[in-house]
Amino acid sequence: FGSESLNARFNAIPGTACADVTVPRDWKNPEDGHTITLRVAKTETSKGNPERQGIALVNPGGPGGSGLPWGPAMAERAPELAEQYDFIGFDPRGVGQSTALECTYTPNPEHDVWQDTKAQVDACLENELTPYITTEQTVYDMDFIRAVLGEEKTSYIGYSYGTWLGSWYQRVFPQHAHRFLLDSAVDISRDGLQTTWDLQPRSRDRQFQDAMLPYVARHDEIFGLGDDPMQIRQRWEDVGGTRTQ
């Protein structure tokens, strides 16, 4: 969303307000004088309810996904929960309308995908903000948002990478964690997210094999690729597709 369309959308949701919150660039060295801003949206829907459960932060995953619209969106999509929770959407550091991480590079049409990716990575490494765009720094941001809102604890809804983020929060701030809903969970027992990326090709291939191909086969009148899933797969591989081993 652009800022104008986003603000217009939020203004149409009763009880929603946006704010910029200033936090240290480095929570491990907050006295160094460097700060960044976080854009936060609060949708207050539980005020006056004697069964109010507090706030619930929301993160859609990524990493790199904008969470700002998700607080207001959850209030609309889950009205029963909204009676008990005020949903908090926020753009994590480096993302969206928070202090953004900008990696400026010029694509080279002669580069293959790996060379182009390396150029992007090198450009990001030149940005002095990059070392501070981490999960650990972000969970400190989340706890600061909780504290600014005057809440003793926070609940949380996270999807995909957002489950990794939520698990980190619980590990660092267990005393402030209330109810956490982790959907499409990342394996927090691993040393890092790389194992997730390693597994994704096989996961995507299984979805293609078990869901997409049978669907195409059932609708041959639309796609015209035949009614046998394995034959359709073979045709796909013949024109350049690859099978994940």
Give each language-model segment a name.
Residues 1-245:
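Gly/Pro-rich cap/lid or specificity-loop segments adjacent to the active site
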